[in-house]
Amino acid sequence: MDKKKDLLENEQFLRIQKLNAADAGKRQSITVDDEGELYGLDTSGNSPANEHTATTITQNHSVVASNGDVAFIPGTATEGNTEIVTEEVIETDDNMFKTHVKTLSSKEKARYRQGSSNFISYFDDMSFEHRPSILDGSVNEPFKTKFVGPTLEKEIRRREKELMAMRKNLHHRKSSPDAVDSVGKNDGAAPTTVPTAATSETVVTVETTIISSNFSGLYVAFWMAIAFGAVKALIDYYYQHNGSFKDSEILKFMTTNLFTVASVDLLMYLSTYFVVGIQYLCKWGVLKWGTTGWIFTSIYEFLFVIFYMYLTENILKLHWLSKIFLFLHSLVLLMKMHSFAFYNGYLWGIKEELQFSKSALAKYKDSINDPKVIGALEKSCEFCSFELSSQSLSDQTQKFPNNISAKSFFWFTMFPTLIYQIEYPRTKEIRWSYVLEKICAIFGTIFLMMIDAQILMYPVAMRALAVRNSEWTGILDRLLKWVGLLVDIVPGFIVMYILDFYLIWDAILNCVAELTRFGDRYFYGDWWNCVSWADFSRIWNIPVHKFLLRHVYHSSMSSFKLNKSQATLMTFFLSSVVHELAMYVIFKKLRFYLFFFQMLQMPLVALTNTKFMRNRTIIGNVIFWLGICMGPSVMCTLYLTF
């Protein structure tokens, strides 16, 4: 009985017991829930498991006075880092222990899919697979491999010939007595009706399938029009400025402090290896992730962003274009650090649980006759072994913790993804012709963006600043001027928005993916067909969406015990804060305009889910594009004018 008491008083065993208690929620992937839950859609999913965030666990200790044995009443627990707080309660009934030890049997339900023997992994939330980007798969590749010129006329002529042949055949049957007689003689079968085109007795059935055409030629014409328009604008600007491009403000912005920006960016990248050092210390046994490792990492992540914001603004005093580039890149590196650190942090917890469960089984299996206690430890070993072994299936040398290395982190930072895992789908070779194509697309798109900014946007921005600095003549007058500026800048912003999307999510990410042989090119969905802001939030930026889904939405549910609505609010709130910080970096002031419009997406999502809007997809898409066309322009002019 003393051994049993020792085991039951062990904090590690208490933790395992609580993780699998009936009231502790399912021990499973933090993102098993359907992605639609993040945006208020009607879905049903399992409760997420916990990420590594400090959580307090209350353990009620029931001391049984009748025989001196100690039983522990389960409290609540998480999979994260835990701080044990004990409360002794004197009880007089040994049945207390027996009742609560039954909760160990819930382990199987918590770690197995219902009705099957399959484990529920912490990382079941998303998968990576070989797939091209939408533009490559739907437009570029078909255009290169299947374009054969005009096909509609050929198809029409083919069908006309088929129809003429059918009519001749019918005419021949009608004029031939033998053919007509044979029609009614079908070996006793029911008579067959012969359709004719010459009489109204029967109707000729003609295939009415809609004939589709290939619009690849218009794809070429579109880019041709863009190219000629850009060349014309370039020539006009050249002659209007005395045969020189030196006066281009946008060109000056793009070429100022390039060496300084590159140096800061390199320093920022190298400083991300701090999290690798923390993982090495955990690997060597210097630190424990569950007590100090996650704290050091979290503090460093916060200081990382604040420091580089302060450095670029107050010390280096860089131009706003340089500052926003470095700020956005710092966010990318921050998300990569967080995913790498907390992925391995979770596995440290699993590894420690496995070691404890194995040692406890070896020590107590023959001395404790309670099958539920032994079963809990056996199931713990089974699940933890599965979780550790399933992270690296093709390369056994990279199994945790062997994956913790500077090389592993380096390749992760090179891959166009924000979610860390040990293995990714990889292509066999680099297509250098494809890389060249994307490099040309990158510089060509930047060139178009510079022309658009210089001709359509910069003059309006200067007028907006002049309005802001002018004498105040009343709110109505200022609003009228703001509306005029808004109308003038909308066309330029629409072009800039589309070019910016193409530059980052197609040209740059696909180029990086090809250079690193990263197989999954699903960086965006067909967001242009969205009928609600819920769809848009999910598919316009897949890498960030996946990060928010795993490390914010589900983690907030696990760590802070939020429900789905509260976790959705938490996710949108954090996203809105980051967007507002970006506006602060650009405009040097906090106005919370973008924060407000970001949070406004939540009631808009609810509106699109109403019965009136649910089946009106065309109206939904029109409203969506109205927001896309007007939103960025409204934001820019508000920050510039007020």
Swiss-Prot record:
Residue segments, region Disordered: 174-194
Q: In which compartments does the protein localize?
A: Endoplasmic reticulum membrane
Q: Where is this motif: FYXDWWN motif?
A: 523-529
Q: Catalysed reaction per UniProt?
A: ergosterol + an acyl-CoA = ergosteryl ester + CoA; zymosterol + an acyl-CoA = zymosterol ester + CoA
Please list the GO biological process terms of this entry: ergosterol metabolic process
User: In what way does this protein cross or attach to the membrane?
Assistant: Multi-pass membrane protein
Mark the residues carrying the PTM Phosphoserine: S175, S176
The annotated active site, in chain numbering, is H579
PANTHER family on file: STEROL O-ACYLTRANSFERASE, STEROL O-ACYLTRANSFERASE 1-RELATED
Protein's UniProt name: Sterol O-acyltransferase 2
